[in-house]
C-alpha cells in the first residue's frame, strides 16, 4: 500500500508546524480523502473518519471559538485519535490553547497554512491522490514533447532510448527511461513518472548510463508528466500492412484509462524522432479540431463526386 509521511505534506504545501514532535511528522497517511469536521464539532461522531487528515477552515474555527473552553477541549479530545495523521488549520487562523493541549495529550501534529481553505483543500487532495494512487510499471520512454506526454514503447533493442536522447537534443524533455510508473490521476487522466533510482538517467547501448540533467541541463528533464499519447515502434515488415491514413484507431489502456496509440515502422533511413514529433503535433491538432485525415476524406469525396458529374 502506498503511503505519504506527514513531513512530506508539510514540505509540499509549505505548512507551518504549530505543534509536532519529530516522531509525529513520521506518521503515515494512507487515505487521500480529507475531512472537514463540521458535525463532529457539535458532538456527532457517527461515521467519523479519524484516519484522514482533519482540515479546519473559517466555519469550523468560528464554531469552535464560540464554544465554552471546557466543551471545546472535550470535543477536540474526541476528534484527536491515535490514527489521526494531522490537523491543519487554514487561513492563518490562531490555534486555540485547548487544541494545543488536546494535541499534546493525544500526540497529534497541528499545522497551519495561510492559504484559503478551498484552495488548500484542492491542493492537498490533488497531492494525496497522485501520491497514493496505485502505480503500474510499463517498459518504455516517457517524453514531454511540445508540452505533451508521449510514451514510446517497442521491442527490446529497437532504439527507444536512442530516440529519446535524440528528442532531448531537439529541445524536448525526458521524464523517464526504461521503466515508467503510471497512475490514474482521475477517471480520464494518466500520469507518469520515473522510478526514483532511474530519475534523469537514460541507458544507451554501447555508451552506458547517461545523466541527462548533468549533460543537457535542468531544462532537458521533467519529474512527471501527463501521458496523452502512446507510440509503439516496431520493425518494418514488407508483409505487414501499416496504417497510412490514420484511420485505424488503437488504444493503450493502463489503470482503466485508455489513451490513443499509434504504430510506427522502423527501418534504416527513417528519422524516428521527427516522425514522433509530427505524431505529437498531429494529435494536438486533432484535439483542437483539425483532422488532416478527415480533410483528405472530404477532398477525395468531393473529387469523386465532381468526376461522376463530368462523366455522366
Swiss-Prot record:
Q: Which UniProt keywords apply?
A: ATP-binding, Carbohydrate metabolism, Kinase, Magnesium, Metal-binding, Multifunctional enzyme, Nucleotide-binding, Serine/threonine-protein kinase, Transferase
Q: Which residue ranges does the record annotate as region Important for the catalytic mechanism of dephosphorylation?
A: 265-270
* Catalytic activity field: [HPr protein]-L-serine + ATP = [HPr protein]-O-phospho-L-serine + ADP + H(+); [HPr protein]-O-phospho-L-serine + phosphate + H(+) = [HPr protein]-L-serine + diphosphate
Q: Name one GO molecular function term.
A: ATP binding
- The active site consists of 139, 160, 178, 244
> Which residues participate in ATP binding?
154-161
Query: Which cofactors must be present for this protein to function?
Result: Mg(2+)
Q: How does it assemble?
A: Homohexamer.
Q: What does this protein do?
A: Catalyzes the ATP- as well as the pyrophosphate-dependent phosphorylation of a specific serine residue in HPr, a phosphocarrier protein of the phosphoenolpyruvate-dependent sugar phosphotransferase system (PTS). HprK/P also catalyzes the pyrophosphate-producing, inorganic phosphate-dependent dephosphorylation (phosphorolysis) of seryl-phosphorylated HPr (P-Ser-HPr).
**NCBIfam families, A to Z:** hpr-ser (TIGR00679)
Descriptive protein name: HPr kinase/phosphorylase
Q: Which organism is it from?
A: Streptococcus pneumoniae (strain ATCC BAA-255 / R6)
Amino acid at each position: 500500500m502506498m503511503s505519504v509521511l506527514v513531513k512530506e505534506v508539510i514540505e509540499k504545501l509549505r505548512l507551518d508546524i504549530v505543534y509536532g514532535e519529530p516522531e509525529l511528522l513520521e506518521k503515515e497517511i494512507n487515505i487521500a480523502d480529507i475531512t472537514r469536521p463540521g458535525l463532529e464539532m457539535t458532538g456527532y461522531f457517527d461515521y467519523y473518519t479519524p484516519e484522514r487528515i482533519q482540515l479546519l477552515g473559517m466555519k469550523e474555527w468560528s464554531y469552535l471559538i464560540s464554544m465554552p473552553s471546557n466543551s471545546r477541549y472535550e470535543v477536540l479530545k474526541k476528534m484527536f485519535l491515535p490514527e489521526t495523521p494531522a490537523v491543519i488549520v487554514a487561513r492563518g487562523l490562531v490555534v486555540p490553547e485547548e487544541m494545543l493541549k488536546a494535541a499534546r495529550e493525544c500526540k497529534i501534529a497541528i499545522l497551519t497554512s495561510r492559504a484559503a481553505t478551498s484552495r488548500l483543500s484542492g491542493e492537498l487532495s490533488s497531492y494525496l491522490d497522485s501520491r497514493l494512487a496505485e502505480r503500474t510499471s510499463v517498459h518504455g520512454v516517457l517524453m514531454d514533447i511540445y508540452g505533451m506526454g508521449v510514451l514510446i514503447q517497442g521491442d527490446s533493442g529497437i532504439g527507444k532510448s536512442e530516440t529519446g536522447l535524440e528528442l532531448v537534443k531537439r529541445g524536448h524533455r525526458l521524464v523517464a527511461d526504461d521503466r515508467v510508473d503510471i497512475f490514474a490521476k482521475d477517471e480520464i487522466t494518466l500520469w507518469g513518472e520515473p522510478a526514483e533510482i532511474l530519475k534523469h538517467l537514460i541507458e544507451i547501448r554501447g555508451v552506458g548510463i547517461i545523466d541527462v540533467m548533468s549533460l543537457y541541463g535542468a531544462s532537458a528533464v521533467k519529474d512527471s508528466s501527463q501521458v496523452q499519447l502512446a507510440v509503439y515502434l516496431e520493425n518494418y515488415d514488407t508483409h505487414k500492412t501499416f496504417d497510412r491514413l490514420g484511420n485505424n484507431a488503437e488504444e493503450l489502456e493502463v489503470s482503466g484509462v485508455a489513451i490513443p496509440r499509434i504504430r510506427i515502422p522502423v527501418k534504416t533511413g527513417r528519422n524516428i524522432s521527427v516522425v514522433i514529433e509530427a505524431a505529437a503535433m498531429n494529435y494536438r491538432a486533432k484535439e483542437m479540431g483539425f483532422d488532416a485525415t478527415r480533410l483528405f476524406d472530404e477532398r477525395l469525396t468531393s473529387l469523386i463526386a465532381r468526376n461522376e458529374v463530368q462523366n455522366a
